[in-house]
């Protein structure tokens, strides 16, 4: 579970920096679809929505992991399956779409329960619950939109950050070549890809065989894995880096470094803007660490307990 611990630490540190600012999150802290989902989930219990600060009244005292009474869930292509749930004051948590929130591993359920339990005494900040946002999106949005998500991910390929370089010989090009070499080596060894690298401003079209192999790899992902890759690819501007990181080939800190490589080089040259670049860094840390942590918890098994311990709450949904 080393990968999960590293991702959790990175996400927690970034969230503390964002929460310390107060008020609403900066633009891009979470995909709009996920942020709306988290608000809808908490707001349904109160019959309202988040206020202008992006917060909700806290309407529960205890969040805990429970054995889900509806069992393993329905069969279906890519449908998340699990036997664990999260209860708020013994009321089962449901998605914004009123679907049961089933977790494939106890570890993931415990992490989501912790996100709820560690909210403030008076208010809930949905933007500080990246795992909850990802899980809700996977359950409500992904099953009916898998084809569109895969197509959207493939749109990254021709201009993938791992494949588009600055002019040869420049410091940026050297940093890109050194940084992305392990990602491309992994893509060759694990996926059988031979992607083209280019310094053209508009990227370069990739071969049909490369596109076909990547499409097949994406279609094999379950809904939770797919939503993790989707958010991570957006944060990194790289499908290849997102796949490598969610497969454990690139650590969370290295993934974050590569995701911000160009921006950090610009900061080195021109200086950092307080209240701008520092917030961008925290935003990127959450968007990178959250998906990696999600996949690590999926693959790391069911170790770990829920916040407040495992309970017997199996009542109505929130």
Residue positions per predicted region:
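An internal, amphipathic alpha-helical element
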Residues: 206-275, 286
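Short cationic amphipathic helices and targeting signals
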Residues: 99-103, 161-164, 171, 241
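N-terminal mitochondrial targeting presequence
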Residues: 1-51, 318
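Internal, conserved structured core segments that host functional sites
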Residues: 147-214
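Intrinsically disordered, low-complexity regions enriched in glycine and serine
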Residues: 3-10, 72-77, 302-315
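An N-terminal structural lobe/cap that precedes and organizes the functional/catalytic core
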Residues: 43-144
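Long hydrophobic alpha-helical segments typical of transmembrane helices together
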Residues: 256-304, 308-318
């Amino acid at each position: 579970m080393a990968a999960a611990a590293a991702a959790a630490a990175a996400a927690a540190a970034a969230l503390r920096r964002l929460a310390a600012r107060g008020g609403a999150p900066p633009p891009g802290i979470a995909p709009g679809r996920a942020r709306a989902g988290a608000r809808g989930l908490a707001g349904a219990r109160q019959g309202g929505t988040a206020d202008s600060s992006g917060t909700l009244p806290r309407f529960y005292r205890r969040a805990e992991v429970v054995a889900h009474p509806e069992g393993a869930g329905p069969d279906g292509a890519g449908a998340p399956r699990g036997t664990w749930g999260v209860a708020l004051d013994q009321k089962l948590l449901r998605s914004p779409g009123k679907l049961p929130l089933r977790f494939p591993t106890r570890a993931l359920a415990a992490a989501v329960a912790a996100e709820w339990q560690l909210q403030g005494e008076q208010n809930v900040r949905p933007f500080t619950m990246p795992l909850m946002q990802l899980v809700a999106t996977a359950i409500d949005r992904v099953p009916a939109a898998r084809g569109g998500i895969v197509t959207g991910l493939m749109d990254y390929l021709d201009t993938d950050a791992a494949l588009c370089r600055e002019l040869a010989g420049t410091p940026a090009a050297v940093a890109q070549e050194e940084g992305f070499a392990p990602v491309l080596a992994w893509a060759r060894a694990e996926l059988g890809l031979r992607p083209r690298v280019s310094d053209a401003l508009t990227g370069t079209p990739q071969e049909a065989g490369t596109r076909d192999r990547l499409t097949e790899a994406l279609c094999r992902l379950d809904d939770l894995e797919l939503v993790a890759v989707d958010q991570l690819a957006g944060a990194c501007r790289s499908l290849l880096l997102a796949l490598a990181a969610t497969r454990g080939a690139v650590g969370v800190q290295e993934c974050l470094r590569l995701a911000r490589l160009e921006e950090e080089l610009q900061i080195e040259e021109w200086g950092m803007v307080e209240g701008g670049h520092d917030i961008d860094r925290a935003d990127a840390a959450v968007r990178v660490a959250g998906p990696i942590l999600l996949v690590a918890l999926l693959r790391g098994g069911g170790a770990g307990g829920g916040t407040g311990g495992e309970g017997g709450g199996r009542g109505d949904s929130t």
